[in-house]
Design a protein with these regions (language model features):
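Glycine-rich FAD pyrophosphate-binding loop
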Residues: 22-41
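Dinucleotide-binding Rossmann-like beta1-alpha1 core, especially the glycine-rich loop
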Residues: 44-121, 130
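Beta1/beta-strand and adjacent pyrophosphate-binding region of the FAD-binding site
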Residues: 1-12, 28
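Central helical "cap/lid" subdomain
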Residues: 183-250, 316
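Conserved FAD/dinucleotide-binding core of flavoprotein oxidoreductases
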Residues: 211-214, 221, 230, 235-311
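Helical element adjacent to the flavin cofactor pocket in flavoenzyme catalytic cores
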Residues: 133-175, 184-188, 192
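C-terminal catalytic lobe of FAD-dependent flavoproteins
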Residues: 269, 277-283, 289-372
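Short beta-strand to alpha-helix junction loop
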Residues: 59-60, 87-96, 134-153, 296-302, ...
Length: 372
C-alpha cells in the first residue's frame, strides 16, 4: 500500500486526507497545533454553492456539499440543509437577481420569492423595504468548530487515517517530512498550510500571485426558546462579493451605487451574512482586508458597520453579541480560485481557495488526487 502525508488539519487538509484514503492510500496528517485553529473554524460554516459561478466551480461545490452531507450523517455531526435567502431592498439589487435567475434557470434550483414567501422561510427577515429575495435550496450549514474537531475522529475510525497533532513540520523534501529531529517518509506529500506561507516553500510562495485576507466576525448568544432562523441570510452587498453574479450586466450599476452611497462598506470589503448553529447561536460577518501582514487588533468600527447593515434587514429574538474574532485566509490576486503547485513529482501544495474553503475543498481534493 502506498502512503501519503498531509500537512495541515484544516478543511483543505482533511479533504485531501479523505480523498487519498478513499483511493487506498495509508494517510498520515500532521498538524502543528493540538487542533486546527485557523480559518477553518473561524467562518460561518456555510457550504455555499449559490455563490459559485455556473460550470466547473458550481459542480465542485455541489460535489463538496454531497461529501459534507455524507460525512455529517456518518459521523453524527450537526448539519442543516437550510438553503439560503439573499434579501433585496432596492430596484438595482432586484435587477441583478432577476438577471441571475434568468441566466441560471437550467443550472440551479433558485427562484425569486415575494417578501411574504421569504419571511416564511426565515422569520429573521424584516418586512420593511423588502422587495423580495433570491431563494436557493442548495446551501448547507455546519458548525465549523464542531465539524473540524470531529472529522479527524471519524476519518481515523473509517479509513485508519493517522493524525499527529502538536507536530510542527519544519522542512519538506522529496519523500521526506521533518518534524524537529524526526523524519517521516511517504510516497506522496501534500502541503495544506493555509495562510502560513513563511515556513514551507517560502521562496515558491513569494513567486505566486497570492496574498492574505483578514476578516472580522461575530456570534450572538444562543437564541431563546429554541428559536430558529431557517435559511442562511445575506443581502444586496453579497451580490458584489461572489463570482456567481459577475456575469450579470446590471451588477456594474449596483457597484457604482454602493461606491457612492456606502463607501465605507466598499472600503472595508463588508457584506453581511448570517447563519445559525445547532446550539442556537447566530454567526455574523464579515469584512475583508488584504495584505501579507495584519495588525492583530479588531476594529470596533467595522463590527458596528456590520451590525448596522444587519439590523437594516433582520431582527433576532436576541442580538446580544457573545463573541467576536478575526480570521485570516489565503487569497489569489489574479482571479484564480485555487493554487495547486508541484515543487517536485511527489510534493503537492494546495492553497488559495479564498473564502470558499468550506464550499470547495472536498471537491477540489478529489480532483487533485484523481490522477495518483
Amino acid at each position: 500500500m502506498k502512503n501519503a502525508i498531509v500537512i495541515g488539519a484544516g478543511i483543505v487538509g482533511l479533504a485531501t486526507a479523505r480523498a487519498l484514503a478513499a483511493k487506498g492510500f495509508a494517510v498520515t496528517v500532521i498538524e502543528r497545533n493540538e487542533l486546527a485553529v485557523g480559518a477553518s473554524i473561524r467562518n460561518f460554516g456555510m457550504v455555499w454553492p449559490i455563490g459559485q459561478p455556473t460550470g466547473k466551480l458550481l459542480e465542485r461545490a455541489m460535489r463538496s456539499r454531497s461529501i459534507w452531507q455524507e460525512l455529517c450523517l456518518a459521523a453524527n455531526i450537526w448539519h442543516e440543509e437550510a438553503g439560503s435567502l439573499l434579501a433585496v431592498h432596492h430596484r438595482s439589487e432586484m435587477q441583478v437577481i432577476e438577471e441571475f435567475v434568468a441566466q441560471n434557470k437550467n443550472d440551479r434550483h433558485c427562484e425569486i420569492l415575494l417578501p411574504k414567501e421569504a419571511i416564511e422561510k426565515s422569520p429573521a427577515l424584516r418586512n420593511e423595504n423588502l422587495l423580495g429575495a433570491l431563494w436557493s435550496n442548495t446551501e448547507l450549514i455546519v458548525d465549523p468548530r464542531e465539524a473540524i474537531a470531529q472529522l479527524p475522529l471519524f476519518l481515523k475510525e473509517k479509513w485508519g487515517i493517522k493524525f499527529l497533532f502538536n507536530q510542527g513540520v519544519s522542512h519538506v523534501e522529496t519523500s521526506k517530512v521533518l518534524v524537529g529531529k524526526k523524519v517521516f517518509e511517504a510516497d506522496l506529500i501534500y502541503v495544506c498550510s493555509g495562510q502560513e506561507f513563511e515556513t514551507l516553500f517560502p521562496e515558491l510562495y513569494a513567486e505566486q500571485p497570492i496574498t492574505k485576507c483578514k476578516l472580522q466576525m461575530l456570534r450572538t448568544a444562543a437564541q431563546p426558546n429554541g428559536w430558529r432562523m431557517g435559511a442562511a441570510l445575506s443581502a444586496g452587498l453579497t451580490l458584489t462579493h461572489y463570482g456567481a453574479f459577475k456575469d450579470c450586466a446590471s451588477l456594474s450599476a449596483l457597484k457604482k451605487r454602493y461606491e457612492a452611497e456606502m463607501p465605507e462598506y466598499v472600503k472595508w470589503g463588508i457584506h453581511v451574512m448570517a447563519s445559525q448553529q445547532g446550539t442556537g447561536e447566530v454567526t455574523l460577518g464579515d469584512s475583508h482586508e488584504y495584505g501579507l501582514v495584519f495588525d492583530p487588533f479588531d476594529k470596533d468600527y467595522i463590527n458596528h458597520l456590520i451590525l448596522d447593515y444587519l439590523d437594516g434587514y433582520t431582527h433576532f429574538p436576541t442580538r446580544h453579541i457573545a463573541q467576536t474574532w478575526n480570521g485570516t485566509y489565503a487569497k489569489m490576486k489574479n482571479g484564480a480560485t485555487e493554487l495547486v503547485l508541484h515543487p517536485s513529482n511527489d510534493i503537492t501544495i494546495i492553497n488559495g481557495l479564498g473564502g470558499a474553503g468550506m464550499t470547495l475543498s472536498f471537491g477540489l481534493a478529489e480532483e487533485v488526487v484523481s490522477s495518483v
